[in-house]
Amino acid sequence: MNNPRTVSDTKRAFYHNHARPINSIYRRVVEELLVEIHLLRVNQTFVYDPVFALGVVTTFERFMQGYHPPADQTSIFNAICLAQELDPQQVQQDAQELLGRVRGQSLESLLDWISTAASLGGDEQQNRLRAIASNPTFKYSRLFAVGLFTLLEQAEPELGKDEARLLQVLQQVGEVMHLPVEKMQKDLEQYRSNLEKMTQARKTLEDIVAAERKRRQQNAAPDRSPESASATEAPN
């Protein structure tokens, strides 16, 4: 029997695939995501699914927004997936296919689609949701909740701003999918709170960088004070 991978193994694998330094506030985001996915992957009841994939992609994209250089974002995402022995292209594809399957639906239509999926199945995406709903040992996770919220948010973009409405929708989905509504509610509250904190931290960092750039430009500019101008223009 093979020993389970450790968090250290996962982090080592990540930095093997992405050796470049990660900028300041984003480093914590990456390492927390690495640990979160790792702890799920080593759990024997965890089963990969498209909703989880969408949660991973959404979390990465929203928390890594504004990362410089932008080209490194793909490398970092790929390294996160490879460190978890996941195919990054497959994760992206599963997330986009799930979003594409429900794109353009109203919230009511989406809820009907989920309800049908949970009880009867249907197309490939619905069958995978039915497998989740009928699995008594399904390993719920925050990333799954984020993926589910992303689907709901696509159908009704303002849903997150109406707490009562969001709770009502989560209860409806939780009932048919056999999901822990209270956990979902708390996880999504934390997710949105952390996202807001990240937005504020990013704005602060941008202000600091802009101020430093301005200071350097001022230091590099020629001194045009009256004294220096007089000295420059004084006859020999």
UniProtKB/Swiss-Prot annotation:
Biased composition (Polar residues): 227-236
Region: Disordered, residue numbers: 206-236
Assigned keywords, A-Z: Coiled coil
Top-level lineage group: Bacteria
Any one of the GO CC terms: plasma membrane-derived thylakoid photosystem II
Biological processes annotated in GO: photosystem II assembly
Pfam families: ThylakoidFormat (PF11264)
Residue stretches in coiled coil: 180-220
Known role: May be involved in photosynthetic membrane biogenesis.
Family: Belongs to the THF1 family.
NCBIfam families (UniProt xref): PS_II_psb29 (TIGR03060)
Protein name: Protein Thf1
